[in-house]
Amino acid sequence: MCTVIQGFGPFGDFPVNPSELLVRSLAERGDPDLRTEVLPVSLGRTAAEVPRLMEKYRPRVWLGVGLAAGRTALSLEAVAVNLAGWPEAQADADGVSVTRRPVAPGGPAAHLTTLPAGPILQAWREAGIPGYLSQTAGSYLCNFSFYTAAQAASALGLPCLVGFLHVPLLPELVTDPARQPSMAMALQAAGLDCVLEACRAASPAGPGGVYR
């Protein structure tokens, strides 16, 4: 069973999305067990592609990666909520804005991550990489893709590790260093490697599909 790493392309004021760079750098390794996908920041295409890719690959691990401008560290998302909404000023790549609506009508209120959060956080601490467990993935496409992936894995009955990692801005994207925190690409990549290693070491799913 493979590992899928899904990032996003540019959006809004960010002509470069570090999640895309991270995912493409993983693709260059030529790991036969790794599948990398970069999606546009698009509601419609994310809604269509995430379930399609989940069914196509039927992975053991699904990790989404996205940019969270303003955050000071890597943030492993604890939960995806069944809520999508963003204003016209933050319209997606197709010009779509959303007034509060469910990600999946009739779906559960939330999906908890099944990534091994404890080992990931410990690996970050040991490597000196700033990171924490976040309690909100927002209500934009990052949360949308996280929830959609978890919902798709559940519908397919897959004992799949599903989760999402938010990364800060890259230093070269910062226009006001005093107000905009950032993290170097090398440190982000090292943090992502910690996540992947912890997932590979996780034991098979226990009751409820949660990996130990």
Per-region residue spans from a language model:
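A short pocket-lining beta-strand/turn micro-motif at the edge of beta-sheets
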Residues: 159-163
